[in-house]
Amino acid sequence: MKLNELKAALAAHPDLNLRFLLPNGVAVPEHAHVTEVARIDKRFVDCGGKLRADALCRLQTWVADDLHHRLVAGKLLGILTKAAAILQSEDLEVDIEHEAGWISQFPVESVAAVNGELVFRLGVRHTACLAEDQCMRPPPGLKDFKLSTLEFKPIAK
């Protein structure tokens, strides 16, 4: 989800409490805080040697001991408005950083008003080759190769 889409959902429901649903369907405790809004810039070289750049907006959550805390959509919208100078774009993808045993980042797949809450459905990221045309591919015929056809010989010492 893009930042501009997220902000529109927040603006449309400013009084609703936020709820974050992890990809496994487990909800982040409702008293979670959004403790950080960041622009993450990544510059890297892919496996084919091509220089690449990527940027996203990351919202960090934190579950504190104050069980009565609730974050409403309007407050998060205000925080995002204050962060506009560092975000520099509303076209950034948004992800949520959350710690549940370890720190993980989840892309925001959708936001919808459900049963009086603004529910963020979080997804998962997968790795992929960014330069498939440059990667080594097996020669024709080798793709059907079976390891069981190999003859193993002991290595001489």
Task: Name the predicted role of every residue range.
Residues 78-134:
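Helix-rich interaction surfaces within compact, conserved domain-sized segments
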Residues 41-49, 63-64, 80-83:
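Short secondary-structure capping micro-motifs at structural edges
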Residues 27-51:
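Short, solvent-exposed beta-alpha or beta-beta edge segments that form flexible loop/patches at the rim
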Residues 53-67, 122-124:
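Oligomerization/assembly interface segments of phage tail-like spikes and tubes
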Residues 67-73:
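Short, conserved charged micro-motifs
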Residues 4-36:
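Small/polar-rich, solvent-exposed N-terminal microdomains that initiate assembly or binding
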Residues 29-31, 52-56, 89-91:
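Short connector loops at helix/strand junctions that flank enzyme active sites
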Residues 122-157:
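Mixed-charge, glycine-accented linear interaction segment located at domain edges/termini
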